[in-house]
């Protein structure tokens, strides 16, 4: 006999619904605490009963998954983005959501999310953290330039590039001469911004070093970096979010996972392909598209493909580069599956398989 349990988890409380054939649905509410979850599941388990648990993916779902793995027979982490049509009801409560999850689990209709191991989740989190540091550096630089322009300094003093070491020293000198009058308050602000910039740059250096060292432990990294134009940042993101290449049985599924396949709108005899779905990890999608721009300059076959898709129309450049990015993912999937190094023959050999 099986019990299907749905957890509706938020930061403070968890609502559990137990669905079992021939019995009335049962609800329980408790604090979002691993020990209380384990105690609840222990109460539900009997020698002849198998517990099947589901809850939605969230920031804490990985930790919950690992902690409860030994308390139930199976755990399914659901994708709420693919269940929006199910939740379209006039009434929405935590109890209703928990029951819907349990019922969907009982009929095998939960859109499942792949749950990687802890070290892979930490790898992904570090990649995302580094990306945010890079974004913070860009924001601080833009604020510094805007501040200097607001006081009439429209260009750097030493070289054309604002961010050379010489210009950085020049900005430090500007910030080092504040007076006590309000007219020079901008210099204090500049000093704070330069301190922020130095801190972010130090953090970027440290996180990059850590990621570089970890990437060296991945056997597939050197394989992917044989593709001209693909460096360590793209490689680590692809490997971290791919995790297990065997879970992608087709090229289309691999490209769709990273949100690079077009949306489909079909009705009757009308079939329309729209913009790319942009689902999945945005960090990989952005990096692989940036890599595609570099690859078309170094790979004759992909350059030819890019030009064929563009068809001599400059306004089709973005469409063409997205097509190249899909080809890159197809090549990467083939390389990770077969262990082959990159060569131009791979493009014609694997890129037209589904």
Regions found by a protein language model. Name each.
Residues 54-64:
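Acidic, metal-coordinating catalytic cores used for nucleic-acid/nucleotide bond scission
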Residues 12-36:
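Short glycine-rich, Thr/Ser-proximal phosphate-binding strand/loop in the N-terminal lobe
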Residues 223-226, 232, 236-320, 353:
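Phosphate-backbone recognition surface of nucleic-acid-processing proteins
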Residues 312-354:
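Basic, amphipathic alpha-helical segments enriched in Lys/Arg and hydrophobic/aromatic residues
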Residues 131-221:
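Glycine-rich, often acidic, oxyanion-interacting loops/wings at catalytic, nucleic-acid
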Residues 77-114, 121, 125, 170, ...:
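Short alpha-helix plus adjacent loop in nuclease-associated cores
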Residues 1-20, 101:
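Gly/Thr-rich phosphate-binding beta-strand-loop-beta motif of the actin/hexokinase/Hsp70
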């Amino acid at each position: 006999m099986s019990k299907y349990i749905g957890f509706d988890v938020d930061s403070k409380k968890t609502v559990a619904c137990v669905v079992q054939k021939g019995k009335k649905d049962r609800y329980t509410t408790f604090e979002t605490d691993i020990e209380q979850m384990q105690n609840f599941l222990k109460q539900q388990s009997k020698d002849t009963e198998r517990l099947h648990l589901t809850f939605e993916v969230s920031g804490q779902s990985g930790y919950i998954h690992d902690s409860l793995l030994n308390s139930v027979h199976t755990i399914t982490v659901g994708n709420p983005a693919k269940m929006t049509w199910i939740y379209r009801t006039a009434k929405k409560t935590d109890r209703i959501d928990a029951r819907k999850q349990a019922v969907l689990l009982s009929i095998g209709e939960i859109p499942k999310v792949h749950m990687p191991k802890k070290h892979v989740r930490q790898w992904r989190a570090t990649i995302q953290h580094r990306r945010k540091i890079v974004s913070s550096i860009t924001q601080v630089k833009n604020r510094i330039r805007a501040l200097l322009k607001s006081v009439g300094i429209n260009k750097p003093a030493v070289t054309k590039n604002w961010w050379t070491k010489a210009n950085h020293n020049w900005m430090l000198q500007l910030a080092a001469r504040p007076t006590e009058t309000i007219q020079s308050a901008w210099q204090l602000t500049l000093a704070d911004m330069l301190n922020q910039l130095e801190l972010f740059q130090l953090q970027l250096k440290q996180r990059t070093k850590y990621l570089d060292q970890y990437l060296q432990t991945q056997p597939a990294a050197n394989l992917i970096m044989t593709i001209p134009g693909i460096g360590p940042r793209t490689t680590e993101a692809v490997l971290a979010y791919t995790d297990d290449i065997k879970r992608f049985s087709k090229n289309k599924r691999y490209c769709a996972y990273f949100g690079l396949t077009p949306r489909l709108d079909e009705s009757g005899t009308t079939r329309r392909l729209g913009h790319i779905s942009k689902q999945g990890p945005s960090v990989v999608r952005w990096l692989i598209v940036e890599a595609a721009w570099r690859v078309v300059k170094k790979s004759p076959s992909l350059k030819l493909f890019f030009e064929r898709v563009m068809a001599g129309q400059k306004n089709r450049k973005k469409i063409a580069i997205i097509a190249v990015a899909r080809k890159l993912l197809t090549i990467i999937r083939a390389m990770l599956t077969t262990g082959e190094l990159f060569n131009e023959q791979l493009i014609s050999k694997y890129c037209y398989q589904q």
